[in-house]
Structures are given as C-alpha cells and as structure tokens.
Amino acid sequence: MPIAGKFITFEGGEGAGKSTQLTRLAERLRAAGEGVLSLREPGGTPFGEKMRDVLKQPGSAIQPAAEALLFASCRAQLVADVIAPALAAGQVVLCDRFIDSTVAYQAGGRGLDRALIESANRLACGAVRPDLTILLDLDPARGLGRASVRDHGQPDRFEVLGAEFHRKVRALYHALAQEEPGRFFVLDAARPPEAVEEEIWHEVARRFR
C-alpha cells in the first residue's frame, strides 16, 4: 500500500468516534508495516497541549475570535514542528481534527467569517493539506449523549453549547464535504464501530493502493 508520506485527518461532531477510529486505523497500518504518527488537535506539541487545556476547560471566558486564533496558533506550531517533518520522513500522519474543525466550529457554530478562518488556516498550514479527510457524520443529539457517557457527565466547553450550535457545525461539515468530494470520505457514524472501521480500511486501501 503506497501510503507513506500521506496525511489523513478525522473530522466530525462531538461523540462521533474520531479518536476510536483513528486508533483502529493506526493499529491496522502498523500491522501492515507502515510508520504511523497519531496526533490530536489542539495538541501534539507542548504549546498545543497547554492551549488544549485552556480551550476545552468549562467556563473559560474566551471570545470567539480569540478562540479561532488560538486554534490557528496551535496548528501552526504542530504543522511546523511535527506534521511537516513527519510527512517528509515518509510517515503516515493521522490527526484527530484539523483545519475543517475550525471552519465548522468557529465559522459554522460561532458565526465567524469563514473567509477569515480559512485565511488563518492557510497561514498556519502553508502547503500542508490532508490527502484524505474522514468525516464521521452523526446526529448531534446522539453524539452529545455518547460524549456525556464518555466524559462521565463532565462536558467540556464545546459539549455544553446548545443543540443549535451543533446543528450548525454539522451543516457546515456537510457543505465542506460537498465542496471537496475528492478529499472527504463521509461515513454514517451511528453504526457499530467495527462496521465503521472496516469501511475506513477499505477506503484507505482503495485510495492508496
């Protein structure tokens, strides 16, 4: 499977199963002999992990514009320090959230100007773009229910936002997938994790065989 040096991102709303499916794909790729680097956003660098605590902490009074710029700052550090070198070395890079999360959450959910968000993403990422984006699509109510169980009833500052916010996020994810059908692979995340895992594996094999 000629997948060395490819960049795959996982996107979706709360509780869609992104981290679960990323871990399962990483395990299968490693079993196939591939070098894999698994990352998450925000995070992946000392700076990013500190900002993750700030951005996800319930009750953090962060203005939407400041929030968007913090995400872009974390991304710029991650791309320069980790992602770009790993891709250049031939590793497969898997990332739990990337540029599309900021567009969906900050432009879709928060209502910020999408063009400005995308401009910040271009500055943060340079020429680095995902080769494949796996969008795990799930009804927000169901996803938030899953997240509540996962977090033992202690939601982060995005999970506590209202249903309308999360519907807007989902709608913009759908728009992004329609605009770039060659990059996005959209799955029904309401199905059992094993079924989702198999569909992802077949798609990765198809694209990069």
Which positions does each model-derived feature cover?
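Extreme N-terminal, non-catalytic leader segments
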Residues: 1-7
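A glycine- and Lys/Arg-enriched "phosphate-lid" helix/loop adjacent to the NTP-binding pocket
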Residues: 102-171
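NTP-dependent small-molecule kinase module
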Residues: 2, 24-26, 141-209
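Conserved lysine of the Walker
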Residues: 18
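Hydrophobic positions on the alpha1 helix immediately C-terminal to the Walker A/P-loop
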Residues: 21
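Hydrophobic anchor at the beta1->P-loop junction of P-loop NTPases
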Residues: 10
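ATP-dependent small-molecule kinase phosphotransfer cores
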Residues: 32-125, 199
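Walker A (P-loop) phosphate-binding loop of P-loop NTPases
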Residues: 15
